[in-house]
Amino acid sequence: MEVLKVSTKSNPNSVAGGLAAIIKEKNIVEIQAVGAGAINQAVKAIAIARGFVAPSGRDIVCVPAFTDIEIDGEERTAIKLIVQPR
């Protein structure tokens, strides 16, 4: 499964484009985000990507979960958003 890492500084339109391309190619993608700002950007990107794939008759859903990741040698809890067609 392809993993996209989103930060507070990520451009939602850019993330949405990548997300839509991966959904079309592989049918599933995982987005990882740490912190409220990053999660906000990720959710905006999912909403934008839904608009990108809708004209082709597809709809996407998002399943949230927690995951532990390592950043600079430190364990952090992240939100992972599994995005896939409905």
Indicate residue ranges for each PLM-predicted region.
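Low-complexity, interaction-prone regions
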Residues: 1-2, 86
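Conserved mixed alpha/beta catalytic, RNA-binding, or beta-rich assembly cores of soluble enzyme
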Residues: 2-28, 42, 46, 50, ...
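Short beta->alpha linker loops
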Residues: 10, 34-37
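C-terminal edge-of-domain segments
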Residues: 54-86
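Short, hydrophobic/π-rich interface segment
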Residues: 36-60
